[in-house]
């Protein structure tokens, strides 16, 4: 355990400022000689979870597999890389930027950053699954997959930190906000792909429909856990469902839950699902915790 000043991090009052750090995951840091990054939980002085410690709300489940897709913008002086410097001007409309190549689509320094970030994450043992330029100009994504209820969320937090630190030397900022620019521009999400042992091995249409009913029942609870300002992003446009609605659909990126073709193949209804509502600035621990609780409630009927 390591004590720290919680008042300086807005986690405690100055008159009673001590908080504790409990290490939970260790990552080699290739940017330092013999260096490591330590992911820690925050505890109260008595050893109980601090109110900000959403990691402690996740029930351990090695059968829960989670893949998170972290989207973000790279910015300089408040404008995404590649956008005109004039605040009243915009780049060409979306269409050429997704998985784009060439200076006119992705510029020069952005790819250096995302490739270097990938290398540092891999050296750290983070299960970094890939990178791509996203739909809006200056927007990028990386993906992290983990087996076990905590792993993907731990690794997303560390990967975020690595990206922020890396961008310092390029004079570039990371914009995590889910809708930094209004208008005909995609927002940034953190789609949550998930499966359990039961979902992968047994599944079934009856189980799936019960699961979707439960996700709809807890629609508001899920939205509350999926990140701030989501009303700006979940509008029913730009590959989203409206924030006040719930829907699912096979291969439907305008639905709340996208069902892959592989899930319904041969009417098996088993595999993984994608919740498209979590946003880019959401707390991955809160996201995984909420998904896990809803799924566990349904699967309890089958045990």
Predicted regions and their residues:
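Short beta-strand elements
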Residues: 83-92, 188-198, 246-248, 255-264
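Short, contiguous, pocket-lining structural segments
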Residues: 105-113, 130-136, 148-159, 163, ...
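Histidine-centered divalent-metal-coordination microenvironment in nucleic-acid enzymes
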Residues: 71-81, 133-145, 177-198
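A generic structural motif
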Residues: 42-48, 105-106, 146-152, 196-200, ...
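Glycine- and acidic
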Residues: 40-43, 98-103, 142-149, 269-275
């Amino acid at each position: 355990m390591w004590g720290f000043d919680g008042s300086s991090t807005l986690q405690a009052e100055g008159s009673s400022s001590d908080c504790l750090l409990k290490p939970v995951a260790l990552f080699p840091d290739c940017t330092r000689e013999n260096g490591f990054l330590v992911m820690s939980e925050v505890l109260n002085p008595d050893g109980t979870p601090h109110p900000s410690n959403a990691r402690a709300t996740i029930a351990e489940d090695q059968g829960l597999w989670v893949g998170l897709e972290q989207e973000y913008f790279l910015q300089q002086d408040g404008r995404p890389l590649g956008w005109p410097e004039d605040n009243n001007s915009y780049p060409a409309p979306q269409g050429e930027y997704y998985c784009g190549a060439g200076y006119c689509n992705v510029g020069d320094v952005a790819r250096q950053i995302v490739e270097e970030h990938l290398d540092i994450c891999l050296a750290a043992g983070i299960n970094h699954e890939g990178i791509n330029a996203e739909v809006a100009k200056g927007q990028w994504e990386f993906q992290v997959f983990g087996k076990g209820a905590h792993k993907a969320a731990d690794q997303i937090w560390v990967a975020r930190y690595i990206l922020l630190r890396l961008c310092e030397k390029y004079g570039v900022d990371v914009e995590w906000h889910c809708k930094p620019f209004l208008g005909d521009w995609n927002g940034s999400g953190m789609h949550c792909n998930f499966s359990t042992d039961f979902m992968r091995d047994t599944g079934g249409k009856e189980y799936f429909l019960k699961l979707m009913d439960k996700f709809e029942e807890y629609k508001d609870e899920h939205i509350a856990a999926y990140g701030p300002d989501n009303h700006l992003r979940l509008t029913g446009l730009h590959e989203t469902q409206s924030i006040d609605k719930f829907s699912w659909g096979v291969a439907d990126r305008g639905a709340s839950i996208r069902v892959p073709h592989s899930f319904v193949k041969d009417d098996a209804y088993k595999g993984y699902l994608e919740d498209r509502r979590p946003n880019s600035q959401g707390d991955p621990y809160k996201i995984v915790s909420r998904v896990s609780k809803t799924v566990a409630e349904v699967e309890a009927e089958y045990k």
